Amino acid sequence: MQPNITGVILAGGRSSRMGGNDKGLIPLNGKPLFQYVIDRFKPQVSDLVINANRNQGLYKESGIPVIDDIITGFVGPLAGMHAGLSYASTEWVVFAPCDVPALPSDLVSQLWQGKKQALAAYANDDERAHPTFALMHISLKTQLADYLIRGDRKLMLFLDSINAQRVKFSGKADLFSNLNTPADCDLWEQKRRGQ
């Protein structure tokens, strides 16, 4: 049986490929990108929080609590994961980036079932790993902080170092498509209008 799990939307990055515009706030069909993630993610978790390091007031308008990085300096998704592990009142925390509007509706249940005895798991489709879609036990918080303090930033290296379980999401590569550029957003909107 799946326990209560806290969900964390990772929106703390610099969005350099979006020209510095806060990626989660980019409008898609009149709705901010992160709101699509909330709509898909919230039904899967018992508690939801957004990790953001700027424009926090705009994220708070969603009614979802907003937390910033404890380890500062825009050090990447691992800093947001550390903040989420520090915030959570549940034993397990699941993460999703703010730029994947079609994330799988079974993300959390699949990660939970696929983790086996591991303290962490991450998504992998037929083509590649998606380490920002990860489930972690809060006991990893100290190990993650130590990793970041040493200056390490690579998410996959951290997941490998803790023996995270890779969980296969076959036939779902399109659900993990992230929108990194304005052109990606335009293409996504065109596809939605064509459906």
From Swiss-Prot:
User: Could you tell me one molecular function GO term of this UniProt entry?
Assistant: metal ion binding
Gene3D superfamilies in the cross-refs? Spore Coat Polysaccharide Biosynthesis Protein SpsA, Chain A
Subcellular location per UniProt equals:
Cytoplasm
Against InterPro entries, the record matches this protein to: MobA-like_NTP_Trfase, Molybde_CF_guanTrfase, Nucleotide-diphossugar_trans
Q: What cofactors does this protein use?
A: Mg(2+)
Q: What's any one GO cellular component for it?
A: cytoplasm
Where are the membrane-spanning stretches?
none
Tell me which residues bind Mg(2+). 99
The record ties this protein, via PANTHER family, to:
MOLYBDENUM COFACTOR GUANYLYLTRANSFERASE
Please state what the protein is called: Molybdenum cofactor guanylyltransferase
